[in-house]
A protein has these predicted regions:
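Histidine-centered active-site/metal-ligand motif
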Residues: 11, 135, 181-184
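Generic beta-sheet signal
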Residues: 6, 49, 126-137
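Active-site-proximal alpha-helix that buttresses catalytic centers in soluble enzyme cores
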Residues: 2-76, 99, 103, 160
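Short, well-ordered beta-to-alpha junction loops that form the rim of enzyme active sites
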Residues: 54-56, 79, 133-137
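Domain-level recognition of soluble alpha/beta enzyme cores
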Residues: 149-177
Length: 187
């Protein structure tokens, strides 16, 4: 099997925090960040790439300028949605997320372990060059798997930063993490 290129893109800055709105769109800064993806030299040759997004507004809105420029249809894939926090109240989500971040992967709640496994299984089964617009924790799940880290959170991807993956024979053979920065959603 030939090499498959996969690019993960973190969404732009959201108009509200995770604890304030379960599905915010992009802020004005987030819209500008998404527009700048069209000028990113490393994202120029995406004509043969499949465009995939989390179902969340901020991920879809982040993809919109680049997908429009390249006349791409966006596929929504629930696997790349944010970390599941079923039963966690909005006002408690940040504290919950901090506890998840410091927990060994093997001790994560079953729903989070299943979410993590689906992400990895899906990444390893992609058979076409793809760009995926997604979330902080999804990107961390992929890095933790590829680098065999014991905890889920190991990087702080900036808004609209990328992780470039090369996969072959259902294995990640290279991974390059883009810009990192502490953002208001990061822990």
């Amino acid at each position: 099997m030939s090499e498959i290129n996969i690019i993960l893109v973190r969404h732009g800055e959201a108009s509200a925090s995770w604890s304030e709105d379960p599905d915010p769109g992009l802020s004005k800064d987030g819209i500008n960040q998404a527009k700048k993806l069209c000028e990113d030299e490393s994202l120029k040759n995406l004509h043969n790439f499949k465009f995939i997004s989390s179902p969340r507004k901020r991920a879809q809105e982040t993809s919109s300028f680049l997908s429009s420029k390249l006349n791409k249809v966006l596929e929504i894939n629930n696997v790349f949605d944010e970390i599941p926090a079923k039963g966690v109240l909005l006002e408690d989500k940040m504290d919950w997320l901090k506890s998840i971040a410091s927990m060994p992967i093997k001790d994560l709640p079953i729903s989070v372990q299943e979410w993590n496994k689906k992400i990895i299984d899906t990444i390893l089964s992609i058979n076409q060059d793809s760009i995926i617009f997604t979330h902080f924790m999804v990107m961390n799940a992929v890095v933790a798997y590829a680098k065999q880290f014991s905890k889920l959170v190991n990087i702080s991807p900036d808004y609209t930063s990328t992780i470039k993956i090369t996969a072959k024979d259902s294995q990640i053979i290279s991974l390059k993490v883009g810009d990192q920065k502490k953002t208001k959603i990061n822990i």
